[in-house]
Amino acid sequence: MIEIKKAKPTSPGRRHVVSVKNTELHTGKPFKGLVEVKKSKAGRNNTGRITVRHQGGGHKQHYRIVDFKRNKDDIVARVERIEYDPNRSANIALVLYADGERRYIIAPKGLKKDMSVVSGEKVDVAVGNCMPLRNIPLGTVIHNIEMKPKKGAQMIRSAGTFAQLVGKDNAYAIIRLRSGEMRRVLLDCRAVIGVVSNSEHNLKSLGKAGAKRWRGIRPTVRGVAMNPVDHPHGGGEGRTSGGRHPVTPWGIPTKGYKTRKNKRSNKLIVQKRK
């Protein structure tokens, strides 16, 4: 059961907090055999230089090893529990296969404890089941889609997201993404039936800057508030508008300027996003 709760304004930090609580989530620790240490990088690369701004600090986290390939075919798995994962917006499910192996998978909406899921070439079109796109009926809502066969799911993994299978053309399936983009994917690529869980994720309001810091996100300082040495918009006597069209700290135009690189996979886009 999902509970959306608005906090009472007992302090400025609590005034705007909106929390989403799922009473069906596991409250204990994760399964120890599928957890790895996650080292904090704080946005630095191997030379110690900042390569991603606004990262650092935050609560210590452990990485849950999630099975994106779903390659354990024709072995039924029972859902032991649904868990919170601090590394992603979606919830994850711990499943126990008939041969005794446990794995984490992305939990689709509607998947509950003691339900069964299975992967394979020809399995039932049911929530949580994984199969190649060639065996999925047109119009089906899917997620966790591979871009290359056997590589593992790369698309549609965030909370509440889904795509729709709208056509099949020779060796390709045509899928419609949430952005409105129509894209061709090889029919041998796999996908999971259903919508990704935790669709209420966007209703959450952190309420204060400190809650961002708990998540390892540092402040974003405006360029006009900096010195000229730090940003093209910096400096000036008194408050200024920056004196030029908006640019990034490296002088590249921003706010509407397209920076997407041309890639080989562009030829697979049938219709661009809206």
Curated annotation (Swiss-Prot):
Keywords: Ribonucleoprotein, Ribosomal protein, RNA-binding, rRNA-binding. InterPro entries: NA-bd_OB-fold (IPR012340), Rib_uL2_dom2 (IPR014722), Ribosomal_uL2 (IPR002171), Ribosomal_uL2_bac/org-type (IPR005880), Ribosomal_uL2_C (IPR022669), Ribosomal_uL2_CS (IPR022671), Ribosomal_uL2_dom3 (IPR014726), Ribosomal_uL2_RNA-bd_dom (IPR022666). Residues 224-274 are annotated as: Disordered. The keyword RNA-binding applies. Disulfide bonds: none annotated. One of the primary rRNA binding proteins. Required for association of the 30S and 50S subunits to form the 70S ribosome, for tRNA binding and peptide bond formation. It has been suggested to have peptidyltransferase activity; this is somewhat controversial. Makes several contacts with the 16S rRNA in the 70S ribosome. PANTHER family: LARGE RIBOSOMAL SUBUNIT PROTEIN UL2M, RIBOSOMAL PROTEIN L2. This is Large ribosomal subunit protein uL2. It comes from Francisella philomiragia subsp. philomiragia (strain ATCC 25017 / CCUG 19701 / FSC 153 / O#319-036).
